[in-house]
A protein has these predicted regions:
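Active-site-adjacent core segments of small-molecule enzymes
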Residues: 2-344
Length: 344
């Protein structure tokens, strides 16, 4: 098995890619690898490898993916709640990857489990990275419960998984919300949610809890034909080679002291207004971009000035887990760029 020694150059690459962050407490925990009172990022990655297999050079979760490149056309409305330059009126380069959950990059598509990770390049060398999912809420409120839920589900024992849900009301409530949410079988038509809460900091210093959504603008490609094991990705590749996919980025400000920031399983009231802050345009990524995207850690705690992490413990857990996944694959022969749509 080919491996690479983790030298100083690669360590600096880890830092540049966001595997090592220094965003307050979240950065400290990511550096240390701690996820909870007893867990570490290694605990989660070991679980993914043990239950889903180890695929050299790939992410340990969300391994199957397609890279995209594009831009964010900000309309300036987001400046109402955040001083982040991404919300000032203008255009910013974006790269990202559509993926599905799982350690196996060759798993057949099921029409569910879509995710979208993005990196916005901003003035002054700042970046905003976000890793979203086509689900309304997260599966567990704490790292410990998340680990227990994953252990039960990935064990393949349906009775064990059912017992865990039955014994953990927070996970059970989240599962009901996820199952009841509208489903889209294609990447192009799915709605992607931030899952966690963040803090928007305004120019006046006002601090507002926020969540966000990326929603299709209604003109993206329709439901694909379910032909072959990669039908979701082949349809996506065909769509972006034939044109661009367009989405709207919506910020949802919360009410401080009323809307929960610490628990990603809890939805906010449906009547909370949203702010349309601009248009996300995604298209085909050339090979050089695909290679960089493959090697990027889409750590959701990599944030620009004007956006901060909240008290949600899942955020720091995600940072540590993503960092450990990055460290392991950085020592390995890089995976090939995604081959989907080569004949499209």
């Amino acid at each position: 098995m080919a491996t690479r020694k983790l030298d100083r150059r690669m360590f600096m690459g880890l830092a540049a890619a966001g595997a090592v962050t220094v965003t307050g407490l979240g950065g400290f925990l990511a550096l240390e690898g701690r996820v909870g009172s007893r867990l570490t990022g290694r605990s989660f990655i070991n679980l993914f490898e043990t239950t889903g297999g180890r695929f050299v050079g790939y992410r340990r979760n969300h391994a199957k993916a397609l890279a995209v490149s594009g831009r964010f056309e900000s309309n300036g409305a987001g400046a109402e709640v955040s001083s982040a330059t991404v919300f000032a009126k203008g255009v910013h380069p974006v790269v990202g990857r559509f993926s599905v959950g799982g350690a196996n990059p060759h798993q057949p598509d099921t029409g569910s489990g879509q995710a979208l990770a993005l990196e916005f390049s901003l003035p002054g060398g700042q970046q905003w990275r976000t890793a979203m999912a086509a689900a309304p809420v997260f599966m567990a409120p704490t790292p410990e419960m998340f680990y227990g839920l994953l252990s039960a589900r990935l064990s393949g024992d349906k009775d064990r998984a059912a017992a865990f849900i039955r014994d953990n009301p927070a996970a059970a409530a989240a599962q009901k919300l996820i199952e009841a949410a509208p489903k889209a079988s294609s990447f192009a038509e799915a709605t992607y949610n931030s899952l966690n809460t963040f803090i928007a900091v305004g120019k006046d210093g006002a601090r507002t809890p926020v969540r966000w959504q990326v929603i299709p603008d209604g003109n993206n490609a329709g439901t694909p034909a379910k032909i072959g094991p990669n039908w979701m990705f082949e349809a996506l590749a065909k769509a972006i080679r034939g044109g661009e996919l367009r989405y709207r980025l919506l910020l949802q400000p919360g009410v401080p002291g009323q809307d929960p920031t610490h628990d990603p399983t809890l939805p906010w009231p449906a009547d909370r207004p949203q702010i349309d802050v601009g248009t996300l345009v995604l298209g085909h990524a050339i090979v050089q971009e695909q290679e960089r995207i493959r090697d990027t850690n889409f750590d959701p705690t990599v944030l620009p000035n004007g956006i901060e992490i909240s008290d949600d413990p899942i955020l720091t857990a995600r940072a540590a887990i993503y960092a450990e996944s990055f460290r392991r694959r950085a020592r390995e022969t890089p995976a090939p760029v995604e081959p989907f749509g080569q004949d499209a």
